[in-house]
């Protein structure tokens, strides 16, 4: 339990993690690894095609890829969860030797919003617009080396008008809550009830009442956000 204390398993309640630990311990004790299953027919358990690369750490990710003449890019991000961007000063960053360019929302033609369910996520916050969270992209800096890139990002100055923020889902649901998005803070409203929870609690021998919280996390990512792109014929190949 101590070794996996920093792992929050929301899918199986640690079942698969504990099974994997016990299996690894058994293999270490026996000193031999059983052969991979040869039967890949329907209904049989088979290994993932990329499992060996992931568990041994030999997989290649975009951050491991280097190309000749590669340019490095990174975003300057908002310092406030909710603030209006008054001005973006990029002159000093652009003048730094080795900087290829500094791009803002004004340099994006057409649609500047993305999103899975609702396209309400600004790729970059334009002057006059309001940030939605701590880390919204303000501008994108491109440079010849990672060191120059870091220097250039530090030279970008942003003027903000700090605004009241929303600190929790409960605050977001209040009638007078600041709007994180112009269309409202609620994406959808659903009411689901199964059984009689009040009756179940009343009949329970032991009842524990407490406030529980876990840190926010995005699951499934094995590396920070990164992408590598290069010209490919008439288009662009993106590795991400």
Q: Where in the sequence are the language-model features?
A:
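Conserved beta-alpha junction segments in alpha/beta enzyme cores
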Residues: 197-240
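Helix-loop-helix hairpins in multi-pass membrane proteins, especially solute transporters
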Residues: 16, 21-25
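Immediate flanking context of iron-sulfur cluster ligation sites
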Residues: 1-10
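Conserved SAM-binding loop
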Residues: 10, 141, 238
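Structural motif
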Residues: 8, 130, 137-138, 226-228, ...
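Flexible, low-hydrophobicity surface segments
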Residues: 25-189, 207-210, 216
